[in-house]
Swiss-Prot record:
Membrane topology: Single-pass membrane protein
This protein's record includes keyword Iron-sulfur: no
Name of the protein described by the UniProt record: Potassium-transporting ATPase KdpC subunit
Subunit structure and binding partners: The system is composed of three essential subunits: KdpA, KdpB and KdpC.
Molecular function terms, GO-annotated: ATP binding; P-type potassium transmembrane transporter activity
Function: Part of the high-affinity ATP-driven potassium transport (or Kdp) system, which catalyzes the hydrolysis of ATP coupled with the electrogenic transport of potassium into the cytoplasm. This subunit acts as a catalytic chaperone that increases the ATP-binding affinity of the ATP-hydrolyzing subunit KdpB by the formation of a transient KdpB/KdpC/ATP ternary complex.
Subcellular location: Cell inner membrane
Chief location category: membrane
UniProt region (Disordered), positions on chain: 112-132
Entry keyword set: ATP-binding, Cell inner membrane, Cell membrane, Ion transport, Membrane, Nucleotide-binding, Potassium, Potassium transport, Transmembrane, Transmembrane helix, Transport
Record-annotated membrane-spanning stretches: 13-35
One of the Pfam families matching this protein, by short name: KdpC
Organism encoding this protein: Allorhizobium ampelinum (strain ATCC BAA-846 / DSM 112012 / S4)
Length: 191
């Protein structure tokens, strides 16, 4: 009996050590050596203070800042512990009501024209840190007015923060909202 169990126990211990300890430690070591900022969560700092992560969206509610995508996380917006989509299907009346309310709120802030989809829908994770360049461009007038800055200066900040497609073909152009708002604060401090 023991002769039958010994190989199973040996393999269990071996693969637990290999897959549960050796491999994660090796990958962590390589990541820390090659890409330390990314391995540590792409933390964004202002001076010595941590202000967020470039990979996780934040709620910016003041008109002085560009707004992030809506968050789908339950209970509290942008809660990384509750990451996930809404699971509402395209035919869901609740989803249609949420989008209609978001469109109304978007237009109530003085914005006109077509509403970018990412301005009224959440991402699959509910934590997307980026918005489309069009979404950012449509917020320029509101942010410029709230900050008493020339629209052309705010628009230039948006264009400077547009990140192109990866390798020219993967994904869509995007704007990281946290980095844009930090650039906005820095520009406002110099005026």
């Amino acid at each position: 009996m023991l002769s039958h169990l010994r190989p199973a126990i040996t393999m269990t211990v071996l693969f637990t050590g290999l897959c549960g300890l050796a491999y994660p430690l090796a990958i962590t070591g390589v990541a820390q050596a090659v890409l330390p900022a990314q391995a540590n969560g792409s933390i964004v700092t202002k001076g010595d203070a941590v202000v967020g992560s470039a990979l996780i969206g934040q709620a910016f509610t003041s008109p002085r800042y560009f707004a992030s995508r809506p968050s789908a996380t339950s209970n509290s917006p942008y809660n990384p512990l509750a990451s996930g989509g809404t699971n509402l299907g395209a035919t869901s009346q609740k989803l249609k009501d949420q989008i209609a309310a978001a469109v109304t709120a978007w237009q109530a802030n003085g914005r006109s024209g077509p509403v970018p989809a990412d301005a009224v829908t959440s991402s699959a994770s509910g934590l997307d840190p980026d918005i489309s360049p069009e979404n950012a461009r449509q917020q320029v007038a509101l942010v410029a007015k709230a900050r008493n800055m020339p629209e052309k200066d705010v628009a230039a900040l948006v264009e400077a923060q547009v990140q192109p497609r990866l390798l020219g073909v993967i994904g869509e152009p995007r704007v990281n909202v946290l980095r844009l708002n930090m650039a906005l604060d820095a520009a406002g401090a110099t005026q």
